[in-house]
């Protein structure tokens, strides 16, 4: 059976590793939040460009006449 001091040291070691893991995960969350914000900005730019585009002269599928073999 371990002594009380050994148990305390083991718990302190586990706590130190958990604190390190929490900090590493926190840094990953921060990076992912920045990435999501960047991607949202890029999507907004693309939506703006799509909305600003002139309508195409190409007919839509609904406007096309069916091919002769129908």
Curated annotation (Swiss-Prot):
InterPro entries: SlyX (IPR007236). It holds the Pfam family SlyX. Disulfide bonds: none annotated. Belongs to the SlyX family. This is Protein SlyX homolog. The lineage of its organism: Bacteria, Pseudomonadati, Pseudomonadota, Gammaproteobacteria, Alteromonadales. The gene is slyX.
